[in-house]
Amino acid sequence: MEQVLFVNACVRGEKSRTLKLARRFLEVYQAEHPQHVITECDLCRERFQPQYPEILAERDALWSAGQLDHPMFAPARQFAAAGRIVIAAPFWDLNYPAILKIYLERISVADITFGYNEKGEMVGLCRAKDMVFITTRGGAYREAGLDWMEMGARHLEALCSMYGIGRFQCLAVEGLDDVRRDQAAMMQAGLSQAELLAKEL
């Protein structure tokens, strides 16, 4: 039975355009794979704390003592055990909301999500075959040749390499804040893309 982890970083909740895309993707995915179990990690509910000095000190002490089964590392264990990862986050300030970065710092734990071999080379320890990143952007960065300014998907794709996740796919609907465009039609096209991607996995 495949475990699918859905990381919800859509700060605006059900009003979020990104979340609408993610919900449609997951709905179709579940219909295509009824035997798979989808677990949602809502970062707005979880309220993970940033790595303040006292939190980092506790984490370092637990890790040094080999207590990787401690509740502090539960998010990392959940992430590492999932067979598929779906992350939904809007495009904010050229990447994504801070709550997602805080989560990524929480799950990036040596000997859980990644490690090192005898040569000192980094090796991924996650089970996931692929990661799907779903996002919406107000501007049309790809169309304008400004892909280099986009740091969210690029960062997550790099982390896939670190975690040992073999395939990264990004579903991004762009230009949604451009009043010259038909935003409703663009969202509808994005929902269709989400359905197609869900059926292809």
Question: Where are the model-predicted features located?
Answer:
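N-terminal beta1-alpha1-beta2 submodule of the flavodoxin-like/Rossmannoid cofactor-binding fold
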Residues: 1-109, 192-201
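Residues at the starts of beta-strands that form the adenosine-phosphate
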Residues: 3, 37, 129-131, 167
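Cofactor-binding loop segments of dinucleotide-utilizing enzymes, especially the Rossmann-like FAD-
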Residues: 9, 136, 173
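Short histidine/acidic/glycine/proline-rich micro-motifs that form metal-
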Residues: 11-13, 139-140, 177
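Gly/Ser/Thr-rich active-site loops/lids in small-molecule metabolic enzymes
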Residues: 107-112, 154
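Short, well-ordered alpha-helix to beta-strand connector turns
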Residues: 82-83, 128, 165
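Short, glycine-/small-residue-rich phosphate/pyrophosphate-handling segment
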Residues: 116-162
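Glycine-rich phosphate/pyrophosphate-binding loop and the adjoining helix
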Residues: 143-201
